[in-house]
C-alpha cells in the first residue's frame, strides 16, 4: 500500500502545486484494502479529499477538474504513465480510486517477506528503552483464581509486544505479603491449631485458601476476632520487617505467628512459581509489599504538610483538590496502607532500574485509586507518574454475571481452568503436546478480546477446531508444517517441459495480501499495547490460508516452488504472531 500512497502523493503534488500540497496534514492520503465486492485490491478516497482541499484553499481548478471524479481521472491518467506501476486503476462513484494489482506486485511482496522476514516486519519504536511490565500481582496467603490467569497471560503478551519493538523488558510482580488478608489467614490457621509443618507440601495451599475465607468471615462477624486480627496485623508487619532469621523465645505467641507467617509465605511463592511455569511466564523481579512499605511510608511522611495532610491521626491525600477523592496513606495505627505501598513501589522500581516506562496492568476496579496515588506522587516527583502507564482489564465473572471474590470463596481457581481445558481436549489423549494445545487455547480465548471489558470463559468453545480459537490456529500451523515436511521428502518425476508462467489465482493473491498486512497490524498492536489486534489478524489470516490450501495444489503442481514459498511465509507469520501471544504450534494434532 505504501507504493500506492507514494504514487498518489507524487501525482497530487503535480496537480495541486507546492503551496496546496505542502499544506496537507501528515497521513492525509490514505489507502486501504478494497471491499471484496469491488473486485479491486486496494481503494482510496484521496481524490475526493484532495478536491475538497483545493476548494477550501482557494486554489484555482482547471477547466478539466471541476469535480472529485475529474480529479480522480487526472490522477489515474498521470499514474498510469508509469509503466512500472504494478496496478491498474478504476474510478468508482463520485471519485473513488480502485487499484487492481498485476501478478508482478504480489510476486514482489512474497519475495520481500521470503528474503528477509525479520527486517520487513521490524518496528523498533521501543529500541534501547528500559520498560518495566508489572502484572499478575497475586497476594501470598491467597489462592490464584482465573483473574490472575487472565492478567498473567495479558501481561506476558504485552511484554512480548514491547520486546518485539526493541524494548528491554523487566517483568515485575507486586504482591501483598503483609496486610489484613495475611492476618485473617493466620488467625484462622491458629484457630484450627495448624502449625508451620502443616504448610510444607504444595497441596497445603488449599488450607491457606480456606483459612482466608474463614478469617474474613470472623473479622466481619465477630468483634473479638476483629480485635485479635487487628493486633495480628501489627505484629506481622514487625515479623516481616525483622526477616526470617530473627529468633523468638520458645513457646511464645510471636514465635508461633512468625513460623506460620514464613511457612505460609514460602509456600505461597513456591505455588506462584509452579503456576507461572505452567502458563509460560517468568518474572524477573518480585516486589513483596513488605519490601517497599517502609520506603512508601517515608516518602509520605517527608511530604506531610506540602502534599499529604494529617486527619484524625491518619495521613491522607486530599484528592478533592485535584477533582479526585481523598484516600488514607498511613492509618491511625501508623501502618502504611496499600496507597503508601504503591508510593514505595514506584520509587523502588526507579531505584532498581531507572525505567523509561513502567506499564502497570491491573483490574479496572482500581482506576480511580491509581489516579489518586499517581496524582499524589506527581506533586513532588512528577517524572515518575509521567513515565507510568496504567492499563486496566475487566473482571472474570461466574455464571450469572457475579463477580468473583476470594473473600467469599466463590471463585474459580486458576488451576481448575487449566485442568478443565485439558479435560475438554481429552479426545487428543494425554500426549506431551496436550499442554501446548490447552494453554494455547486458554491464551487465545483471553487475548482475542480487547483489554478493558469483562471476560467470560467457556472451555468447550476455547478448544473448538473450527471456530475462532487457539486450537484452530495451532491446527492451521500443523497443517502448514506437514506440507513443508512432505515437500522435503517427496519424489518427483523429472520435468520434460518448461513450467508455464505462474499466474496467481485469487486464493494466492488473497493470502499474500493478508500476509502483507502483518507489519501494519504489529505497528497498531505495539502502539496501542493491544494483543487482540494480533490475535484477530491471525484468525483472519488462517482462514485465508485454509481457502488457499483447499483450492491450490502445492506438491506436484507446476508452481510447487512458488506455492511452497507462500506456505513457508504463512508459517513464519503465524509462528511469529502466536509467539507474541505466548502460544506454541505443536508438532502433531
Predicted regions and their residues:
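Non-catalytic interaction-recognition regions
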Residues: 1-107, 118, 125-589
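Short, charged, solvent-exposed linker or helix-capping segments at domain edges/interfaces
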Residues: 108-113
Amino acid at each position: 500500500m505504501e507504493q500506492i500512497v507514494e504514487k498518489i502523493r507524487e501525482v497530487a503534488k503535480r496537480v495541486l502545486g507546492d503551496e496546496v500540497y505542502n499544506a496537507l496534514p501528515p497521513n492525509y492520503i490514505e489507502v486501504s484494502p478494497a471491499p471484496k465486492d469491488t473486485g479491486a485490491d486496494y481503494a482510496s478516497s484521496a481524490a475526493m479529499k484532495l478536491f475538497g482541499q483545493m476548494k477550501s484553499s482557494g486554489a484555482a481548478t482547471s477547466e478539466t477538474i471541476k469535480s472529485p471524479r475529474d480529479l480522480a481521472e487526472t490522477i489515474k491518467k498521470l499514474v498510469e504513465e508509469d509503466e512500472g506501476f504494478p496496478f491498474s486503476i478504476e474510478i468508482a462513484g463520485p471519485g473513488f480510486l480502485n487499484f487492481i494489482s498485476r501478478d508482478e506486485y504480489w510476486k514482489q511482496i512474497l519475495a520481500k517477506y521470503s528474503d528477509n522476514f525479520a527486517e520487513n516486519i521490524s518496528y523498533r519504536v521501543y529500541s534501547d528503552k528500559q520498560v518495566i511490565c508489572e502484572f499478575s500481582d497475586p497476594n501470598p496467603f491467597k489462592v490464584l483464581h482465573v483473574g490472575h490467569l487472565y492478567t498473567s497471560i495479558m501481561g506476558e503478551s504485552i511484554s512480548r509486544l514491547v520486546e518485539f519493538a526493541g524494548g528491554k523488558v523487566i517483568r515485575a510482580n507486586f504482591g501483598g505479603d503483609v496486610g489484613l488478608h495475611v492476618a485473617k489467614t493466620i488467625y484462622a490457621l491458629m484457630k484450627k491449631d495448624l502449625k508451620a509443618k502443616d504448610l510444607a507440601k504444595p497441596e497445603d495451599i488449599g488450607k491457606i485458601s480456606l483459612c482466608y475465607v474463614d478469617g474474613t468471615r470472623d473479622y466481619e462477624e465477630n468483634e473479638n476476632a476483629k480485635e485479635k486480627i487487628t493486633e495480628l496485623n501489627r505484629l506481622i508487619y514487625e515479623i516481616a520487617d525483622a526477616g526470617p532469621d530473627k529468633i523468638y523465645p520458645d513457646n511464645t505467641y510471636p514465635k508461633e505467628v512468625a513460623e506460620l507467617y514464613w511457612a505460609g509465605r514460602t509456600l505461597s511463592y513456591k505455588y506462584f512459581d509452579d503456576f507461572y511455569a505452567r502458563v509460560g511466564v517468568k518474572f524477573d523481579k518480585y516486589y513483596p509489599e513488605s519490601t517497599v512499605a517502609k520506603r512508601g511510608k517515608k516518602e509520605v511522611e517527608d511530604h506531610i504538610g506540602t502534599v499529604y495532610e494529617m486527619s484524625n491521626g491518619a495521613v491522607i491525600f486530599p484528592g478533592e483538590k485535584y477533582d479526585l477523592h481523598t484516600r488514607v496513606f498511613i492509618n491511625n495505627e501508623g501502618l502504611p496502607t496499600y496507597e503508601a505501598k504503591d508510593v514505595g513501589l514506584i520509587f523502588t522500581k526507579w531505584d532498581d532500574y531507572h525505567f523509561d516506562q513502567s506499564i502497570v496492568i491491573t483490574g479496572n476496579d482500581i482506576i480511580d485509586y491509581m489516579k489518586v496515588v499517581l496524582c499524589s506522587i506527581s506533586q513532588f516527583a512528577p517524572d515518575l507518574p509521567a513515565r507510568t502507564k496504567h492499563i486496566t482489564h475487566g473482571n472474570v465473572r461466574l455464571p450469572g454475571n457475579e463477580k468473583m471474590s476470594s473473600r467469599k470463596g466463590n471463585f474459580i481457581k486458576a488451576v481448575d481452568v487449566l485442568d478443565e481445558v485439558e479435560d475438554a481436549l481429552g479426545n487428543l489423549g494425554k500426549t506431551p503436546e496436550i499442554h501446548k494445545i490447552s494453554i494455547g487455547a486458554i491464551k487465545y480465548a483471553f487475548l482475542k478480546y480487547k483489554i478493558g471489558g469483562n471476560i467470560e470463559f467457556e472451555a468447550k468453545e476455547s478448544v473448538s477446531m473450527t471456530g475462532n480459537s487457539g486450537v484452530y490456529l495451532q491446527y492451521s500451523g500443523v497443517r502448514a508444517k506437514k506440507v513443508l515436511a512432505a515437500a522435503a521428502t517427496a519424489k518427483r518425476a523429472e520435468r520434460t517441459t518448461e513450467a508455464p508462467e505462474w499466474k496467481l489465482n485469487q486464493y494466492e493473491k488473497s493470502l499474500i495480501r493478508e500476509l502483507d498486512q502483518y507489519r501494519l497490524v504489529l505497528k497498531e498492536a505495539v502502539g496501542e499495547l493491544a494483543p487482540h489486534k494480533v490475535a484477530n489478524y491471525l484468525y483472519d489470516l488462517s482462514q485465508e490460508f485454509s481457502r488457499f490450501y483447499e483450492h491450490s495444489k502445492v506438491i506436484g503442481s507446476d508452481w510447487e516452488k512458488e506455492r511452497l514459498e507462500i506456505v513457508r511465509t504463512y508459517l513464519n507469520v503465524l509462528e511469529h504472531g502466536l509467539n507474541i501471544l505466548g502460544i506454541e504450534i505443536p508438532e502433531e494434532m
